[in-house]
């Protein structure tokens, strides 16, 4: 279930626990990370670099893939998508 990063991290701070962030580069990595987070009942941050976003045909595709996986895999733990290691222009394009 996609959630807001600020809310996730505030809850982690208040609960005195950390949240893992893992960079995703393809469908297989994303699936594995989501399934493990669900098995551990742990929130997770999925990092997407500018390059990985381009490789996966854009950030809209990545977001749609994660939403679809959440639904089809029955992911109930909080999930955040994070734009990681990007240029200003690349990141701006991803959210416009």
Language model region names:
Residues 70-73, 83-87:
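Generic hydrophobic/packing signal
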Residues 18-23, 44-48, 77-85:
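Hydrophobic faces of well-ordered beta-strands that scaffold small-molecule active sites
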Residues 25-28, 86-90:
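Glycine-rich anion/phosphate-binding loops
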Residues 5-6, 27-74:
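Glycine-rich, positively charged N-terminal anion/phosphate-binding segment
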Residues 13, 74-75:
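Short hydrophobic "helix-edge" motifs at membrane interfaces and signal-peptide entry regions
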Residues 93-96:
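Conserved small/polar residues in nucleotide/adenosyl-binding loops
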Residues 1-20, 67:
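N-terminal amphipathic alpha-helix/helix-capping segment at the start of soluble metabolic enzymes
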